[in-house]
């Protein structure tokens, strides 16, 4: 790969994976186990901690089922404030859960919020019912409404994502966080080799994208360029720049590293690519995927 070492300005990027919440208004249940994430994490704080993206995709934060619509409304209100205060554009990925009794009402409620462009569920904490007819049917309903779906799964479950992506083409399927690879095991580990095969299978479906995000979280801390590069370059080779989306995963990823460190590492790796590839990864792919 030819290395150009010219990084684009982070102020021109689209952050395709940003979480916002104010726990005094609505507290995700998992904050009980992560009290350091209690408080107000809004656009102003994101900017103070180094976030400078031109536009943003606001991602649901695994709130309680009863709070999902309220969360989307709060995200939409914050998005409106951001749009009014700056030239930034925002899209929302809301919590809409396939194969749940309340799915139809959740989908109808989210469709009333124009900035909602897709849905996501955190599925790495439990069993994924990909094989059920209800799950597939509800995914088809999402697709019929023009919704994409973000999968946040364990890397060992990527084969299920591959199967579903094949069945549901042309629905847009986004794999969050490079498929949560086994970074702690190391690039030369048997686990990494399994991840390589699985993420390549997912990428073979033309309706899939991958988010370049959460590497520090999966590693348990900041990474060096040498540690991060092979995982990024593998996904780039599998998906192509037009299907790789950069995201911060702020603030979730930064208990042991900073947002600035992630932006600097990302800028250096992206800076090794052509200007066209940089534009696709850092802006264009997110705009196309989330219709921004």
Give, region by region, the residue ranges found by the protein language model:
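Mid-to-C-terminal alpha-helical segments outside catalytic/metal-binding sites
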Residues: 1-14, 25, 31-32, 37-55, ...
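Active-site gating/metal-coordination segments in enzymes
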Residues: 69-157, 163, 211-218
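Conserved, mostly hydrophobic/aromatic
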Residues: 17, 56, 92, 119, ...
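Active-site environment of divalent metal-dependent phosphoester hydrolases
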Residues: 21-24, 63-66, 99-102, 126-127, ...
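Alpha-helical scaffold segments that flank or form the walls of functional sites
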Residues: 32-87
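Histidine-centered catalytic micro-motifs
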Residues: 13-23, 175-178
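Catalytic pocket-lining loop regions of alpha/beta-barrel enzymes
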Residues: 131-245
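Short, well-ordered coil/turn segments that N-cap beta-strands
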Residues: 10-12, 52-57, 86-91, 113-117, ...
